[in-house]
């Protein structure tokens, strides 16, 4: 099992820092990628604790952020790092279900991306976060859960455009 801690992604051969994975694709190192989105999806644990659900009262407050555009792009522009869970917590997978198997984050991401084919990546990721937070299918013992996290430095909206699958005739 691969685990990600504060120091990086633990592998069989050692630890790899997420920044070491991203660095070659930054705008100061990969000129042909300037202005193009670079997406890194890290499906791994980020610690040894189980996240639990807490009760809350939902406020009716909406915040709007101003958006500004730069004429030149900063070194870290157009990079998005997507983590299956927040720092310090487990990332879960289902291994014994008859309906589906696999990592909760990846399953939720695929399902939401299919439901929202015209949405940009940050809308999709927000919907994935919501899905993992409220859907009881992504819980253990009605309490333990997983919450993804992303760090986005996108200078424009990014849309996933999938090809329609052809139906196979029997």
Describe each region flagged by the PLM.
Residues 1-170:
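Cysteine endopeptidase catalytic domains of the caspase/legumain-like
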């Amino acid at each position: 099992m691969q685990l990600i801690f504060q120091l990086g992604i633990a592998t069989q051969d050692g630890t790899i820092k997420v920044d070491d994975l991203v660095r070659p694709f930054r705008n100061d190192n990969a000129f042909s990628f300037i202005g193009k989105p670079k997406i890194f999806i890290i499906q791994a644990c980020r610690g040894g604790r189980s996240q639990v659900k807490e009760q809350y009262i939902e406020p009716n407050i909406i915040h709007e952020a101003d958006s500004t555009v730069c004429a030149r792009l900063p070194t870290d522009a157009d990079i998005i790092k997507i983590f299956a869970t927040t720092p310090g917590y487990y990332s879960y997978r289902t291994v014994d279900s008859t309906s589906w198997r696999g990592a909760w984050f990846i399953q939720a991401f695929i399902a939401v991306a299919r439901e929202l084919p015209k949405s940009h990546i940050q809308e999709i990721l927000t919907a994935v976060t919501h899905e993992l937070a409220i859907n009881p299918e992504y819980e253990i013992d009605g309490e333990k859960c997983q919450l993804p996290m992303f760090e986005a430095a996108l200078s424009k909206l990014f849309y996933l455009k999938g090809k329609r699958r052809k139906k196979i005739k029997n």
